[in-house]
């Protein structure tokens, strides 16, 4: 079930509930919500859509684009790995597939 077409506020609340089911720590959930509202994520969301709020994104392809652009951002690799992990968790909430857990085909890894 894909949740991409529900209202942004419902996505935000649903994602928070999703996070709390994975880890019952409210500070953990709040930190993930904060990461999704960061300047970096807003800037990249604006690059791929007319929205600067990731919860307003209307296609899964745009979410994938945000994920990949965040992952490729090279100014602070460690920080962008954290952000891309949060975006991956959000994508899992939206459509059930977490990008960080996807297994690459053997031929893809070898170039």
Task: Pin down the residues of each PLM region.
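Short terminal alpha-helical segments
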Residues: 2-29
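Short, charged hinge/linker segments at domain and secondary-structure junctions
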Residues: 95-109
């Amino acid at each position: 079930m894909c949740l991409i077409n529900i209202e942004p506020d419902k996505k935000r609340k649903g994602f928070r509930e999703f996070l709390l089911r994975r880890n019952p720590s409210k500070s953990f959930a709040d930190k993930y919500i904060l990461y999704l509202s960061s300047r970096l994520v807003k800037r990249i969301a604006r690059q791929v859509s007319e929205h600067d709020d990731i919860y307003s994104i209307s296609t899964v392809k745009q979410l994938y684009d945000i994920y990949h652009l965040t992952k490729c951002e090279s100014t602070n690799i460690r920080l962008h790995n954290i952000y891309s992990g949060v975006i991956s968790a959000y994508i899992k909430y939206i459509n059930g597939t977490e990008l960080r857990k996807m297994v690459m085909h053997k031929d893809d890894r070898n170039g």
